[in-house]
Amino acid sequence: MDEPTILLTNDDGIESAGLRAVYDGLSTVGDVTAVAPAEDQSAVGRAISHEVTVHEHELGYAVEGTPSDCVVAGLEALVTDTDLVVAGCNRGANLGAYVLGRSGTVSAAVEATFFDVPAMAVSMYIPVREDAAFADIEANGDSYREAAKATTYLADHAVDAGVFEQCDYLNINAPVAEWGDAQMTVTRPSHLYEMDAEQDGDAVTLHDRIWEHMADGDIPDPEGTDRRAVVDGKVSVSPLTAPHTTEHHEALDAIAETYEPDDGGEAAD
């Protein structure tokens, strides 16, 4: 492929240090246009709007909308010759199967796959306990060095190598650069899930206990999972598919065959 046209988005907002770090890296291997939210849109999943306002920006376009809005607007109106969509770099990791539908960063990559455009989501792990104030954790442009390096390398090599003939998108998670040089390893999303909730009067507080285990380096995730790789100081790359499909389901077929729409939906004897 000649120099690719790359659409860059994120969910932290177009002014974020992570997006700028990845923009600078990708600009060495492609023609990059940022189409990113004007404000922070973290954890909005694939929320979509009917209409968005777009402002010109030195890096491309600032969109008053969600990451998925940015991808749709970008691919269909603003950067219609896009060869690759990159989302990130997110300030904070997106690890495990359970975050894939929550993350605005990952959701932007998923949105791109429905346009048959290869995509990558990239995030940076910041060690912090859940009871700490995540917003107070500093992450400047230099902290994203490993994430930007890995993203640039994959953007330069993955398409021509046929990677996206076997998957729809890549979910990349890198450690902070302060941990030193990081090897790259191919992973699968961890299935560990430790959400819980505590009620105090009218308030219910939700906790994700996994972050505490990660900060302590005490996780049960086996080798080969994304979370294990990042805690061990490696760049995790998970090749994923977007459409939710299933195998033929005989048990459900049997139930569906007994459904009679004229009897209130009760199954026949």
Swiss-Prot record:
Chief localisation class: cytoplasm
Gene3D superfamilies in alphabetical order: Survival protein SurE-like phosphatase/nucleotidase
Entries under InterPro entries matching the protein: SurE, SurE-like_Pase/nucleotidase, SurE-like_sf
A single cellular component GO annotation: cytoplasm
GO molecular function: 5'-nucleotidase activity; metal ion binding; nucleotide binding
Binding, a divalent metal cation: 11-12, 42, 90
Pfam families reported for this sequence: SurE
UniProt catalytic activity: a ribonucleoside 5'-phosphate + H2O = a ribonucleoside + phosphate
Obligatory cofactor(s): a divalent metal cation
Top enzyme category: hydrolase
Family: Belongs to the SurE nucleotidase family.
The protein, known as: 5'-nucleotidase SurE
Organism (species): Haloarcula marismortui (strain ATCC 43049 / DSM 3752 / JCM 8966 / VKM B-1809) (Halobacterium marismortui)
